[in-house]
Amino acid sequence: MATWNRPHPRQPVAPEPAAEDDSQQPLGRELSEANRFAYAALCGFSLSQLFPEPEQSSFCTEFVTGLVKWLHLSESVLPTIMAFASGLGGEGADIFAQTLLQDPILRDNPSAVSQDLLSFSLKNGHYDARARVLVCHVTSLLQVPMEELDILEEVFLESLKDAKEEESETAEASRKRKEKRRKWKRYLLIGLATVGGGTVIGVTGGLAAPLVAAGAATIIGSAGAAALGSVAGIAVMTSLFGAAGAGLTGYKMKKRVGAIEEFMFLPLTEGRQLHITIAITGWLGSGRYRTFNAPWMALARSQEQYCLAWEAKYLMELGNALETILSGLANMVAQEALKYTVLSGIVAALTWPASLLSVANVIDNPWGVCLHRSAEVGKHLAHILLSRQQGRRPVTLIGFSLGARVIYFCLQEMAQEQDCQGIIEDVVLLGAPVEGDPKHWEPFRNVVSGRIINGYCRGDWLLSFVYRTSSVQLRVAGLQPVLLQDRRMENVDLTSVVNGHLDYAKQMDAILKVVGIRTKPGWREKGLPLAPGSLPQEEPLQTAIVSTDEIILQDGQSQGPASEDSLKTTIPSSASQAQMPAGLNQSTEDSLSTAAAPAEGHLICSHGVGPNPLGCPDCTHGTQESCTELD
């Protein structure tokens, strides 16, 4: 029997390909019958904890039924395992985990169960996000570091890469003749060609089908490899990596879709992974923050990461407006705090200076335009993910400010479709300018398999200002917790890290650490393999630095000087107080009034109410108007 040796964390080693006559079987079947039962019971009980919703019952039933067959357990145990998956029985998952760890095979190699469960989840060429959440959960219960699961996933891909290198000269010549005959010009760009009923998998280019199956045999066993070697099996394998294995880099909006003018994916890293991450920027600033990928250079959630480039023209105008108004506030003469109630976090009283309100259109106009466009971009992203452009792999979405709003409307749109499950693994919304009432987040439980993270800052006065006409009666997610009662929902108070709205871009490295997203230490020198041209050029910031206070992170490290968002002369002792400007001098008002005018005019809602930076749900579906009349 073949055994699995854990490779060194820094240098994953792919196992040797199995011989053709080797009757290799999955590792799970090498366990004793009692431990195979404990293995299935552990998964069943975990499913009941992770996905208790009625909408998930069909997935749990199908998964458990297939796992029992995969482990060659008697059909008589299926009702018992199904009872565990339904939440019945008093046994806990920890009991089954401890039983498994006593097995001789798992005592020295506890990751064997994770490897086998990963193999089972991938046997059909589909990697459901719910399956990965389960694999991660079981891996944690068995006290296996998550880095080892990443290695297992990488080894699976390495077997495919090795198969490509072993492609014979005859097979290569035949493939090239077919490519030339069919004139698949896009093959050079997206790495996939389908010719004469045969399929070439494009993980890193073209892979011969028999060799792909040979490489996968070492991971899923000879029986699974035989299935993958068939025409149907290779087709499903191709679907795992999306459009020819090129992920989302092969997608670019061919024509304008509705109000959207720009929408494309930029690679943040060079690499392939069984799960991908999409980062979404909220605005474009000056200096090193003028590019979409600048805030995400330390992100290390996956080896395959993308940045969504959308509506650069309007995001640049918004960024200029933000920096203009904040630069003018450097001359303010006094400040006062926004007071929040202890229980609800809703603004109790606020008095905005007349000088600031008089130049509010500097930010209101571009903000209102971007509010509408972010909603449309989110809906378009939803349809791309639903069409599996990224392949049948789990997707994690991370965004700040208007980028978080894109994610919000993406989830909202996906929740309306029946096939929305099993696509999204985790979502992270930071400083989200969206509705924070739990009833609006409830449908996301059916879309997101893993975590729904809401990162908020109680002291974000700029976000409060753009919501000034409605924030008294509206719960803004970027200012307070979202009180959704679900195991997925996680609220993270970033007040100690984020001094103002612009810090979401400038302190992203620290923010990602606080919310539990992996970052690469020393990423500038030895980080992830960055895509060519993804690292922005350093340029001096054009905006004034008005505070030299240092932010002390949770790990005790100093995070440099605070940004111009931290405009304060006094610091409130309570975390429930936020800084806001109380007055501007005449020169400041004049400089703000003469700022560049936004591209689109002042937006008036059809309901007849005055201009408002808050997007009205009744208006975002067909117009670019805003309204204070919110449900």
UniProtKB/Swiss-Prot annotation:
The keyword Transmembrane applies. It comes from the Eukaryota. It is a multi-pass membrane protein. Keywords: Coiled coil, Membrane, Transmembrane, Transmembrane helix. Residues 1-27, 555-595 are annotated as: Disordered. It comes from Mus musculus (Mouse). The gene is Tmco4. Residues 156-183 form a coiled coil. InterPro entries: AB_hydrolase_fold, DUF726. The keyword Transmembrane helix applies. This is Transmembrane and coiled-coil domain-containing protein 4. Its main location: membrane. PANTHER family: TRANSMEMBRANE AND COILED-COIL DOMAIN-CONTAINING PROTEIN 4, TRANSMEMBRANE AND COILED-COIL DOMAIN-CONTAINING PROTEIN 4 TMCO4. The chain crosses the membrane at residues 200-220, 228-248, 343-363. Belongs to the TMCO4 family. GO terms for cellular component: membrane. Residues 568-594 have a biased composition (Polar residues). It is found in: Membrane. Pfam families: DUF726.
